Amino acid sequence: HCTARYGYAWVALDEPIADIPDIPEFSNPAWRTIFQFYETWATSQMRALENSFDNSHFSFVHRATFGVPDAPQPSKYELIENDTGFYAETVIAAANPEKFHRISGVQDAVTTRHMRNAYFLPFSRRLDIEYPSGVRHVIINCFTPIDDGSMQLCQWLFRNDTEEDCPAQM
């Protein structure tokens, strides 16, 4: 089974267990699409997905970017299971060094990220990050198993600002 959608071929070797996730931003002219990367990772798709939803790692793994080392306690997720997987929502503190001001649209040294995270069966995720400025940064991850020890990660994102506001190559 192969379907062309969102600029990619979506393949299921057997009958698909779920539909391809709906990504409304893809066809909405108010959003710009940025294809970020397509990489092979030496891990399983379930481990990568688990990490995607683990907000306790931000202060440690992302300390050079948005992690706040002085606030290592993870924020509480509100989790809702649904027919396509689950939806999890939280608000976190995020470091916002000057080099990230254009990404967040915020000038403060520490800001917040309202994170709306969704898991779609079997191996996809959507992370909608909203900053206090109203800037939204929606990340799509698709994790494709290759073998028992590796997977292919495809990531692209959507932003509701302009290239002049925040260049895609930042």
Task: Annotate each language-model stretch with its function.
Residues 17-170:
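C-terminal catalytic domain of Rieske-type non-heme iron oxygenases
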Residues 12-16:
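Short, acidic, small-residue-rich periplasmic hinge/interaction motif at the N-terminus
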Residues 1-10:
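Active-site-proximal cofactor/substrate-binding loop regions of enzyme domains
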